[in-house]
Amino acid sequence: MSLNFLDFEQPIAELEAKIDSLTAVSRQDEKLDINIDEEVHRLREKSVELTRKIFADLGAWQIAQLARHPQRPYTLDYVRLAFDEFDELAGDRAYADDKAIVGGIARLDGRPVMIIGHQKGRETKEKIRRNFGMPAPEGYRKALRLMEMAERFNMPIVTFIDTPGAYPGVGAEERGQSEAIARNLREMSRLTVPVICTVIGEGGSGGALAIGVGDKVNMLQYSTYSVISPEGCASILWKSADKAPLAAEAMGITAPRLKELKLIDTVIPEPLGGAHRKPEVIAASLKAQLLADLADLDVLSKEDLLNRRYQRLMNYGYA
């Protein structure tokens, strides 16, 4: 896979371009007198060291860019890599099937679970079909329908959060966007089965929270979770989206900061350079965390599960 490099990764991109050029020359002419393999190996080591140096000191704005990386794994990528026998379920049984939310039954290490997650697109047509990962009310109602089904069949629920936010269009508002989100918040707090939520990319405001009330909340290392985008915050406070880096730092949107504030449980480490560099590696780490979370929750009775979730919600914020 050809990698897309972000602005702050340009020194790495230049090194990788040199490596690609040398590799191409080596393939074209195997009779060269110089030892290209040694030079390529040296440059690869230099690239890894440079990547390690850059990623050791990332700011919140750079992490926000990584969370939006176009090659970052999405919900269906994790379904393919970490689960078996996925059977997608569609529709809210009231209006339509929102493609920005995907869901269905799968097996996690042989155990049936209900998966629900935001889904963005990669190509232009797919992005439009998925509405860039911004759900309408019917998407959240579909999610709730699947959660209620999981509760009936005593299946744990696993959600993947990756959205800029709920769709703010006129049609979505007319069909009850705020009501759909609020209902999900209420009903998720009452579910009698384990609910594990993981932010895999962008965790945008109420659009993320609508599938984010759980017994365990995890974040990938380079994901973000916030009430508004850094650009939106900057536009309100400083009347300029150019102040987004400053807003990102002030908002505390990164996984380590949210862990420090006790808003999430676990930060799942990503491969060097981000999840898009090695999707199989991050999928294995995510699967291991989900299995560990399920093991912790399986020992709780339904009453204890609900009490624990209630206390979790009551502990948010300051009194």
Curated annotation (Swiss-Prot):
Keyword tags: ATP-binding, Cytoplasm, Fatty acid biosynthesis, Fatty acid metabolism, Lipid biosynthesis, Lipid metabolism, Nucleotide-binding, Transferase
GO biological process entries: fatty acid biosynthetic process; malonyl-CoA biosynthetic process
Catalytic activity: N(6)-carboxybiotinyl-L-lysyl-[protein] + acetyl-CoA = N(6)-biotinyl-L-lysyl-[protein] + malonyl-CoA
Gene Ontology molecular function: acetyl-CoA carboxylase activity; ATP binding; carboxyl- or carbamoyltransferase activity
Any one GO CC term of the record: acetyl-CoA carboxylase complex
Localization terms from the record: Cytoplasm
Enzyme Commission number: 2.1.3.15
Domain CoA carboxyltransferase C-terminal: 35-296
Pathway: Lipid metabolism; malonyl-CoA biosynthesis; malonyl-CoA from acetyl-CoA: step 1/1
Function, as annotated: Component of the acetyl coenzyme A carboxylase (ACC) complex. First, biotin carboxylase catalyzes the carboxylation of biotin on its carrier protein (BCCP) and then the CO(2) group is transferred by the carboxyltransferase to acetyl-CoA to form malonyl-CoA.
Subunit relationships: Acetyl-CoA carboxylase is a heterohexamer composed of biotin carboxyl carrier protein (AccB), biotin carboxylase (AccC) and two subunits each of ACCase subunit alpha (AccA) and ACCase subunit beta (AccD).
Similarity field: Belongs to the AccA family.
Name the record gives this protein: Acetyl-coenzyme A carboxylase carboxyl transferase subunit alpha
Source organism: Enterobacter sp. (strain 638)
